[in-house]
Amino acid sequence: MASIDRHSAIPLYYQLKVWFRQQIESGALRPGDQLPTEAELCDELGISRAPVRQAMAELARDGLIYRRAGAGSFVAPAAAAALIQRTTLRVQAHYDVRWMDSLEQATQRWNAQHPEHEVDLDVRMCTRSEFHQVLQRAAIRGEAPDLAAMDYVWLTHYATQGYITPLDELDARWVAQTAQDLEPPVLRNNTVEGRLYGIPIQADITGLWYRKDWFEGEGLKPPETWDAWLSVFDHFAEPEVMARYGHHYSLILPMTATTGETTTNLLIPFIWMVGADVLNAQGNLALDTHFSELCDMLRFLQTITLDRRDHMPKDVHRSNWWHLARYFAQGDVPMTLGGSYEWPRIREESNWNDETDAAAHLGFMLLPRPSRSVQPVGSLGGTSWAIFQQSEHRDLALELLKLIATRDASRQFCEENLQVSPYVSVNQRFMRAEHPWLQDLVPLLAYVRNRPMHPNYVRISGFIQDMFERVLWEGADPEAAVRKAVQALTVVMAEPY
């Protein structure tokens, strides 16, 4: 029977889908074989219906199984053979594969439109921490994949190193038309030296998730300021309130390098909201330009991570980035730092299924700030598809990206996953009453900023993570930690790239 790893970063539905696909490819499941029912899989695996239902739907969409009303799901005739007689595109992925659905749906549409030139995807996965090393080694050996999906902030490195293709090189007119509809901060993150390198799947906004239903039950408003945030934190730490809702902690947030880029992405708005920055507009080091304000901000965060540590999970320093949403989804905390990208994982780990559920029970806001006079700010994130220069199928890969970039495809993907679209025209359609969650989320895009777009960003981010870990977890003096980070970043900025 299928097995899943609940501690893996790979989404539950994807683990289940891959397992059945492998069974079909190997012949262990033959055409006509009946699959277990959704209820049976839920009972055996100990998971909710949402990931099981999604796995079955995608297997059916890919033509590997079919459903018979009242009878169940069965392996489709000649399913294994259909996987073999196709042009293969190699795809490099890390374990956060939710965006893979965009490519898989585009591949399905392509195959339906071009039965004489069908495509199959050979997806190789690695951990997020191994991702860059795997890609660079493959490129050095001349074995780079055709396609890879990567965080916006990684594109600058791969573009300046010549690993990925400027898309206007393949179809300048289509690229120009697509760029016109991209949200401005998304366009900035996908453009290097005036050329578009990535086709974005969604746009992420960082902020604070909170239990809207619990807040309303307690007569509390979402905390806009640091003082209000501490007050709400302490309220949910009161024994009688904890007994009322059954939670164990008040808040979870990343504070060590264990959560990797998530730490930088979620915490960098605190740097911005006090007037500081990592790099200035000219790309020069700027972390020490608002030194005293930066240190004051770190001291404030210490009032949470040090003074109130008993009301946070004891293993938070060892938690991986995907654990943050799990605590929240399972009702262990009323608040967690996170990104708008968390909804699919929250849905998997909870009994909430759709946009109506999200709007009724949950809230998402930009991070609390020093005072209301300070403008709210969030960090922009997202995932983009990029085509590698070594690919022998660059034109074919671009055709798939064109299908991903259609506004209908973007709308469908973002509606299903409750994500902000990278396209202005799609987001305008979400500003309607039938989208109670997205119509509140999309306006936050006006307040986002881009993380540093620098070829050495991965190393720069590593030292920012180290600074936060030393201060928030180890209790280091903020002034000493900032000075150490500035010294390290000065060396990094002087290195060639």
Residue ranges and their predicted role:
Residues Y197-I201, L230-A286:
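Extracytoplasmic/periplasmic solute-binding protein
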Residues V153-I205, G246, T263, H361-L366, ...:
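Hinge/lid segment of periplasmic solute-binding proteins
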Residues E216, A446-Y497:
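Conserved C-terminal helix/tail region of periplasmic/extracytoplasmic solute-binding proteins
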Residues E116-D181, G217-K221, R326-Y327, P334-M335, ...:
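Extracytoplasmic "Venus flytrap"/periplasmic binding protein-like
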Residues D307-R309, E348-L418:
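Extracytoplasmic/periplasmic substrate-recognition and gating elements
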Residues A359, M365, C414-F463, R470:
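Long, aromatic- and glycine/proline-rich binding clefts that accommodate carbohydrate-like moieties
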Residues F233-H235, Q282-V316, L367:
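Glycine-centered hinge/linker elements that transmit conformational signals in sensory
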Residues M1-E44:
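Extreme N-terminal segment that seeds HTH/winged-HTH DNA-binding domains in transcriptional regulators
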